[in-house]
Amino acid sequence: FDLANNYGHPSNGLAEKNFGQALKDCLGTYRDELVISTKAGYDMWPGPYGNWGSRKYLMASLDQSLTRMGLDYVDIFYHHRPDPETPIEETMGALCDIVSSGKALYVGLSNYKEEETRKAVKILKENGTPCLIHQPRYNMLERWVEDGLLSALDENGEIVVDAVRYCIDGKYACACPSISRQPIQPESK
């Protein structure tokens, strides 16, 4: 299950809250068989520590995510996007401490470009926390990962998970509610 602190409409965190309810109602007995991930990095609350990659934001965000889902830990905690202001050492240090605390088993990156990924992975490895996975936007329309990122990931042994944001032919759009991020389109021919 792939979640993030800012997923949900009409309010951030609603996807995690709904998932937490489903986990409580019917999936809880399967927890050891589930891989649950969440992310932090986008706008979550107003103020200087409401987004990006500061230690304060990442720690607080994960604590809130765990509360919404009713969990003690997640399998994977991603940093959702690089932070142009916070030193990467602070962001990666926070991820290492999150794993050390037992609140996440593994860490991942999302939307990091090649050079950012190389720096982040190096810092994580130096601190004994390997980067398990990278989730870029990669599809027929967004192929930027082919400009070096895939090679960097292959060198370090990370898994790439495609975050497909587009349904080219609209085949599944008719099943989406009107408030979905996926626009409703007529059935393709």
Language-model region placement:
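Short, acidic/polar
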Residues: 52-69, 90-93, 117-121
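A short, structured active-site edge motif that brings together acidic residues
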Residues: 31-44, 135-137
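N-terminal binding-site loop/beta-alpha segment at the start of enzyme catalytic domains
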Residues: 2-35, 183
